[in-house]
UniProtKB/Swiss-Prot annotation:
It is found in: Nucleus; Cytoplasm. Component of the PAF1 complex, which consists of CDC73, PAF1, LEO1, CTR9, RTF1 and SKIC8. The PAF1 complex interacts with PHF5A. Within the PAF1 complex interacts directly with PHF5A. Component of the SKI complex which consists of SKIC2, SKIC3 and SKIC8. SUPFAM superfamilies: WD40 repeat-like (SSF50978). The gene is Skic8. This is Superkiller complex protein 8. Keywords: Acetylation, Cytoplasm, Nucleus, Repeat, Transcription, Transcription regulation, WD repeat, Wnt signaling pathway. Component of the PAF1 complex (PAF1C) which has multiple functions during transcription by RNA polymerase II and is implicated in regulation of development and maintenance of embryonic stem cell pluripotency. PAF1C associates with RNA polymerase II through interaction with POLR2A CTD non-phosphorylated and 'Ser-2'- and 'Ser-5'-phosphorylated forms and is involved in transcriptional elongation, acting both independently and synergistically with TCEA1 and in cooperation with the DSIF complex and HTATSF1. PAF1C is required for transcription of Hox and Wnt target genes.
Length: 305
């Protein structure tokens, strides 16, 4: 427990190339903290966070090209990764073995995300569709069509009701998962949407864009609730804190920023990376933040809670 933000741990040379994606899952029952990273070196790495440091548990081979997105199931010991090789792979975190390889072609699967119940895996495509795969079956079950451009980012709402997608032209779409209907189209950004994240109560959607801005939307009414500036360049990733009151962002300006949702202000900036910071996540209780970037490093920060 701490009352200030500080860098706690640095894993240098964590991969042999840029690290573009990170996930952190806390297994509360067994008190296990798992971090998964995906890199342009074609590898997925599984780390355990214990005694205030990361320990490499598995280095997972299988992708033929760079890994651009990783996620960890909220209910099962499974990780998923998507790659420029147009395949999604599912990995067993208990033995480090590949469980499934899903052909997500014809071109590529960009961002992927597990549904809150971990029954499904959603991935954005270059054709403006979100493909939904069954985790058990490994098959495509249905698609949500934005009728738009290349989808760079997707997110499920924690209550399982909504799926949001962000496209290369700055358009954000929110779908009702139960009906598959498009609920809202938001046009708040004029440049690519690199990342989006719902608040834990599923009421707010935070978006990150190459225009340097972060926007906060009220999901139900599709109202813009705030525009935040502070990054000097592209905002590459955003992630909400489990406490509902903060979120974190990372940027090509090499910084990681923590924001207060209520006041819409930046309350802390970390300048520890040497290059663009592609991925950022909180752990299960919001006491830590992990970040990854082009400098091939993984950083873990302490947060006051």
């Amino acid at each position: 427990m701490t009352n200030q933000y500080s860098i706690l741990f640095k894993q240098e040379q964590a991969h042999d190339d840029a690290i573009w994606s990170v996930a952190w899952e806390t297994n509360k029952k067994e008190n296990i903290e798992t971090v998964v990273t995906g890199s342009l070196d074609d590898l997925v790495k599984v780390w355990k966070w214990r005694d205030e440091r990361l320990e490499l548990q598995w280095s997972l081979e299988g992708h033929q090209l760079g890994v651009v997105s990783v996620d960890i199931s909220h209910t099962l010991p499974i990780a998923a990764s998507s790659s420029l090789d147009a395949h999604i792979r599912l990995w067993d975190l208990e033995n480090g073995k590949q469980m499934k390889s899903i052909d997500a072609g014809p071109v590529d699967a960009w961002t992927l995300a597990f549904s809150p119940d971990s029954q499904h895996l959603a991935t954005g495509t270059h054709m403006g569709k979100v493909n939904i795969f069954g985790v058990e079956s490994g098959k495509k079950e249905y698609s949500l069509d934005t009728r738009g451009k290349f989808i760079l980012s997707i997110a499920y709402s924690p209550d399982g009701k909504y799926l949001a997608s962000g496209a290369i032209d700055g358009i954000i779409n929110i779908f009702d998962i139960a009906t598959g209907k498009l609920l809202h189209t938001l046009e708040g950004h004029a440049m690519p949407i690199r990342s989006l994240t719902f608040s834990p109560d599923s009421q707010l959607l935070v978006t990150a864009s190459d225009d340097g801005y972060i926007k906060i939307y009220d999901v139900q009414h599709a109202n813009l609730a705030g525009t935040l500036s502070g990054h000097a360049s592209w905002v590459l990733n955003v992630a909400f804190c489990p406490d509902d009151t903060h979120f974190v962002s990372s940027s090509s300006d090499k910084s990681v920023k923590v924001w207060d949702v209520g006041t819409r202000t930046c309350i802390h900036t970390f300048f520890d990376h040497q290059d663009q910071v592609w991925g950022v996540k909180y752990n299960g209780n919001g006491s830590k933040i992990v970040s990854v970037g082009d400098d091939q490093e993984i950083h873990v920060y302490d947060c006051p809670i």
